[in-house]
Amino acid sequence: MRIFISTGEVSGDLQGSLLVGALRQQAEEQNLELELVGLGGEKMAAAGLTLLANTAAIGSVGLTESLRFIIPTWQIQQRVKRYLKTNPIDLLVLIDYMGPNLTIANYLRKTYPNLPILYYIAPQAWVWSPTKRETAQIMAVTDRLLAIFPGEAEFFQKQGLDVTWVGHPLLDRITKEAPSRGSAREKLGIDHNETVITLLPASRIQELRYLLPSICGAAQQLQSQLPNVKLLLPVSLKDYQPQIEQTLKEFNLTVQLLEGKETLTAIAAADLAITKSGTVNLEIALLNVPQVILYRVSPLTMAIARRIFKFNLPFVSPTNIVLNRGIMPELLQEQATASNIAQAGLELLLNGDRQAKIAQDYQELREALGEPGVCERAAQAVLEFANGQQKSRA
């Protein structure tokens, strides 16, 4: 059996690696000959995927921000088409990554109409889409959906799609891989009297430009107002390190840089995280660390979103979306200033009542994400679906 898995960006590589590992384990237990090939990043390759192209750094949010990736994405898609013409697959598994994945799925739907397509982790068009067009595009190419959020499952079930809610795979990652606060601080050589602030600015290149300066400015202010502040910054992709180091130098900040694989350690050790909006917000919440969440896109992208698409979401972070209330502060676009970030951070660090409420909200969030064993359930559903489709075509 050959399964093609397609995703992109840092978060897709992480989610994909967890699925690849679970698929390989189940195939071994079932004595099933399984070949996994596709698009992703180093984590997926390390887990056992034959990588056709590395797409971990190819991703953006916004119209103008995506322009630089048009040619690389097109080239990768042509490579995928050539591969699939000579290497038939039994199942296509898509993970998030809406634009590129829909292009591949539409090609396969037209060229091989009987090929089954499973979406694992649907793009969050169900949250942010201003029209029904994006939902219709996903529905048109999806035979089965494995949802990680309850709201995601409910939304697509109402649209008539075959959906199974498996829970969020980060539950498994945190359970198996995350260190305790004490062991994380010991590993990093942090004294008990130090206040640790972990900075998580970017999984996309555009975020270094739009978010890192404000984050550094906020860190500067917090260091000037609090004693014994230690700053940590895990670098999600090695290619980002030169730009990060240059920005830190401009702000005269002393920050302990860590490899991306140390992200959970950097979070677990923290008293506060200052972070971009994204999947990492759930990791922070599952490790019970207060966080200030921010996001920015180019002014042109935001102007188009507001005026043409009437962009007006109550929340953008998954921590707030899951519970449908603002359990953590979000600072978006013009609000994402250094002073606003620092002020929100001080409130989270110094207000004991707020910290107690955060702990309660985080527990509710954890319960809403399902039970551990997510990756095993997802892998089982993928293999059962693939086997069922093979038998129906036989």
Curated annotation (Swiss-Prot):
Pathway: Bacterial outer membrane biogenesis; LPS lipid A biosynthesis
GO molecular function: lipid-A-disaccharide synthase activity; phospholipid binding
Reaction(s) catalysed by this chain's protein: a lipid X + a UDP-2-N,3-O-bis[(3R)-3-hydroxyacyl]-alpha-D-glucosamine = a lipid A disaccharide + UDP + H(+)
GO cellular component: membrane
Alphabetic keyword roster: Glycosyltransferase, Lipid A biosynthesis, Lipid biosynthesis, Lipid metabolism, Transferase
Single biological process term from Gene Ontology: lipid A biosynthetic process
EC category name: transferase
Highest taxon, organism lineage: Bacteria
Entry keyword Chloroplast: no
A Pfam family reported for this protein in Swiss-Prot or TrEMBL: LpxB
Signal peptide location: none
InterPro entries in alphabetical order: Glyco_trans_19
TM ranges: none
EC number: 2.4.1.182
Residues forming coiled coils: none
Functional description taken from the UniProt entry: Condensation of UDP-2,3-diacylglucosamine and 2,3-diacylglucosamine-1-phosphate to form lipid A disaccharide, a precursor of lipid A, a phosphorylated glycolipid that anchors the lipopolysaccharide to the outer membrane of the cell.
The family this protein is said to belong to: Belongs to the LpxB family.
HAMAP family assigned: LpxB (MF_00392)
Protein's name according to its UniProt entry: Lipid-A-disaccharide synthase
Organism: Synechocystis sp. (strain ATCC 27184 / PCC 6803 / Kazusa)
Source lineage: Bacteria, Bacillati, Cyanobacteriota, Cyanophyceae, Synechococcales
Gene that encodes it: lpxB
